[in-house]
Amino acid sequence: MRVKILPLVFMTLLLIVPSQMLLPSGQANASTPGFIERVYTDKARYEPGELVTVTAQINNSGGTNWSGDVTMTIFHLENAVYSSVQHASIASGQTTDVTFSWTSDTTDFKGYFVSVDAGSLGQGYSSIDVSSDFAKYPRYGYISEFSSNETAAESAAKVNELAQDYKINAWQFYDWMWRHETMIKRTGGTIDPTWIDLFNRQISWPTINNQIAAIHNQNGAAMAYAMIYAARENYSGFGVNPEWGMYMDPAHTKQLDVDFGNNSTYMYLFDPANAGWQQFIHEQYLDAIQTANFDGIHIDQMGQRNNIYDYSGNSIDLATRFTPFIKAAKTKLTAANSNQDFMTFNIVDGTVNGWAANDVSKNANVDFLYSEIWHLSNSYMQLKDYIDSLRANSGNKAVVLAAYMNYGENIGDRYEAEDAALQHTAVNTDHAGYTGSGFVDQFADVNDSVTFTITAPEEGYYSLVFRFANHSGYTATRNLYVDSNFEIELPFQNQPNWDTWSHETWHQVYLTPGTHTIKLSYDSSNTGAINLDSLTLGTFDEHSIRLADAMMAASGATHIELGEDSQMLAHEYYPNRSKSMRSTLKSAMKDHYNFITAYENLLFDADVIDNDAGKQFINIAGVNTSPDGAANTVWHMSKRTPEYNILHLINLVNNDQNWRNSGNQPTAQTNLATKVYIGAEETITGVYAASPDHNQGATQSLPFTTGTDSSGSYISFTVPSLEYWSMIYMKRSTAAPVDNMYEAETAIKSNVSVNTNHAGYTGSGFVDQFATVNDGVSFIVHASSKDDYVLRFRYSNGGSDANRDVFLNGKYAGTVQLKHTGGWNQWAYGELTVPLAQGSHSVVLWYNSSNSGAVNLDHLKLDKTYIWQFDRQIASVPAGYRITFKAGLPGWVHFGTDNWKNVMDIPLASNGSSDSSLNYEASIGPFPSATTVDVTFLWDDNNNGILEDMIDRWEGTDFQIAIP
């Protein structure tokens, strides 16, 4: 959360028609006498084995009655798992609900695609999430309006719309509370029916309860927004002690606060690590859950703060104080009710290694990760890298991003003020920065007015955004009229000078299609002078949003963006409705959320891992591709699960590399002849394509061929079309090679060749000409279990010492040393130890600009290992495992067996680690059962690389490792 000081009247909403109107999610087919308007399920999420009800709303707009079979088919990925037929009769001009039931599978955490076929009346689609825990796949929405005028039926309707049409399964209740330190207002121990919040909005307690009940009817989760460290003005009267506070000076004369600019409203900040504050505010969290029946707490904060102190004058490192607070809060909530202890925390301004990001994502016991993105991760690739880091840090917890699309842009149909109907005003050009041919001046007296005539292309919400200047020294006001009806008095805040233009005054209305008049008038109650530049119908840009949502989902994250009344987040203050969605974007969002629900297992599961992003894996004929979201390219993103290889194609052609700003319609791609290189040990048995942009996400089987060329083994297929985002998933089996030995000559090769002119190689040859920048060999390996493994690269080197960088699943894993072996016919191993989850992984040995030397590469051997470190000494290792020693100094591992028999020395080689205590390693073994390994170390303090046992320093301690 960023706090922005906004007068309440900036955030206004006019409801002219019922807000629960639902738009069709189906697609009409002009060649048929009707269409399926929508297909939806009765809940947002289902428990394993729970009964699922699917409803298809079918319209018969033809001139005759229709009678026929309606078929529902449920798919898990490419496989149909259930089918049912209902006979229906629909009178001409009528819409009928056809209902199906299915008892969900007892397997937890699975997504399903639902297809309904009504023959000549068309097809419709939906999805089903079978998950016992929403936090596994959080599709997070929000509620920010709690009006006392909202009935229980209206509360249910707006919740049901988000659950049924957009598959939202959790809701953040934004700014629902009375005060930040006293969330529920009571008088004499009784809860008040309403209260006034921080921004002077009325909050209705019955409405909050109705909304939570509606969410629970959808099997959704209601999360109470709360700050981690905030209390309002006069907090002492509510039981808060100033000694718990954070201060700007050691003498605690100035407490950290947020001033809301009206000389009466403040938010004061408190130390999250202070035990008194924790005890107090955790009780408030518990009260919110137990009294309102929330399911958990959404904890917010306001970003980086430096040079702060506690009451006693001690300097505070705020970034390290969130995790202890979260752990204590979680413990308290769990002790009270483990079914209502969900928790997430906002990592503000998220970026790789950003402020507080690593500590919270690694150590805080939140149920899913949540991060508000500002300006440290502006590009697609920066954001993907950040998502990757959060998932890696947390053991693949779910990630939700608060990323405000088109932030700060004044976009949509624009009407220039100088072209409007003017009364008692003038047009001028004497202040720079206006749009059009000028601006309206002398808008300063009673009876002055500007009347715009606008066109609404469709029925729906429209955001009226006024661009103005005001340097009169105070806030000016004008009355707004829509179609001659008074709506509201709007403020126009004072600006630094008359050349500063603002578009932060807005008002949202619901309009019918056609022409409307929008009038700003200086009436007798108004004050101040303004210059008026334009009126914009603030509108979200569909192209950038579809691309950004595609990128986030393909990277393994979801996006909080949808709220009540089909609103989308325009701002960090959620009630801000300065932009609206048009129907085409709403339809695209329905398809997107249906897609990410149906295919959640290929997008968000913990065993979905990155493949290397290098171009050596993908070739699309005649298409400019990139592995990193470069501007004007088709971005290819490869992933894999234990059963599938996955290729995401995101169409950035005609767009730049940044996700937030408005964009362009991507240049459509058709018939993409695609070649995907695979490991020699992989077998592909099916290729499938699915996209939210086509057939509302239905899977299509693609014909494919297999082959081998100079680069390696591949499959080839044609992707019929690419609009924004297509996902190709390939069913795969893997046969691990004998002794886990992966031959280099059959791997994926980049700018190298295969040769047999030096004896001693294994397999059918070795990789030659591995000698210049961007040469590489890429392996796909299979780990039989989750373990540490030594990557053992067998090579020969008849020249100078060499090294190569190693990339594991697309991330730098270290550098392997490939020293001179004494000749090209003499082979040795260079090693690097890495952790591997069970399943397939990409291992790339690459010549980067920082590397040197020429080598021949024979094979990669994958050996399980245990790691011995001075701070983590192990006493035993299973038979068959190697032992990797890691240290922070060069030297040798001096070892023998069974009381120092068969003594050997193995050099500790630099591994490229950034950890200076673990940046050298060597492995030994494996050893048979009933063996004792004796180990010590000889340190090369003079760093000459020569073992000098009378000169180099001995460790002085012997260590024993048992092999049971």
UniProtKB/Swiss-Prot annotation:
Which molecular function terms from Gene Ontology are attached? carbohydrate binding; glycosyltransferase activity
Reactions catalysed according to its record: cyclizes part of a (1->6)-alpha-D-glucan chain by formation of a (1->6)-alpha-D-glucosidic bond
Concerning SUPFAM superfamilies, the annotation shows:
Galactose-binding domain-like
Under CDD domains, the record lists: CBM35_Lmo2446-like, GH66
User: Hydrolase: is it a keyword of this entry?
Assistant: no
Q: Name one Pfam family in it.
A: Glyco_hydro_66
Task: Report the PROSITE patterns cross-referenced here.
Answer: CBM6
CBM6 domain boundaries: 413-538, 740-863
State the signal peptide span: 1-30
Role noted for this protein: Produces cycloisomaltooligosaccharide from dextran.
Protein name per its UniProtKB record = Cycloisomaltooligosaccharide glucanotransferase
Task: Give the source species.
Answer: Niallia circulans (Bacillus circulans)
